[in-house]
Amino acid sequence: MYLLNPDLPVVKPGYKGNLWKNKQFDGGDYGSSQASFGQLIQWQLGRNPQQEEKKADKFRLKVHRNTSFITSDEDVIVWLGHASFFIRINGVSFLTDPCFKDLPMLKRMAALPCSIYDLIGIDYLLLSHGHRDHYDERSIKQILDQNPKMELLLPLRLSELLGKRRKQTNYPEAAWWQQ
């Protein structure tokens, strides 16, 4: 079965939607693989060829604490750590994949350039997918509470993670190749 949002246009001719198999999305032609339990254990216990290099790399970008980008009228892109960005284009502001707190077994590598409480007046929240390093419930809840008029831009079925908030938030969900 293929799923897409019937209310949104599809920009790729002939695209049927995202492949939905066994109650989950499947990459289909884009490469999907289901690892066996044994392969998972082997991957987790196996040697990582980049492990030493990663441990030795102490480079971190210097974080400049500043809130002027939030209230400025200028077009701007500000990195907030990992996959989180504040973007303003022609006066419209976007926040991507907010993950502003340490997660279990996953620590932030850089501080925020501002307080999470400074992130107000945001027009759109863009969530790329539901992995924990892109979808942090605590950060999303706080951003939604601080920006009650903010709209969400979501991939298909991600609204299910929003729980009760689904009813109080405006969001279109899109398949690949939908605008």
Enumerate the predicted regions with their spans.
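Active-site metal-binding motif and surrounding structural segment of the metallo-beta-lactamase
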Residues: 12, 17, 106-154, 158
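Functionally constrained cores in energy, signaling, and assembly domains
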Residues: 75, 93-96, 124, 167-169, ...
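Short glycine/proline-enriched coil/turn segments at helix->beta-strand junctions
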Residues: 90, 148-149, 167-168
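Catalytic metal-binding/acid-base residues of hydrolase active sites
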Residues: 101, 131, 177
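Metallo-beta-lactamase
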Residues: 1-104, 114-118, 154-179
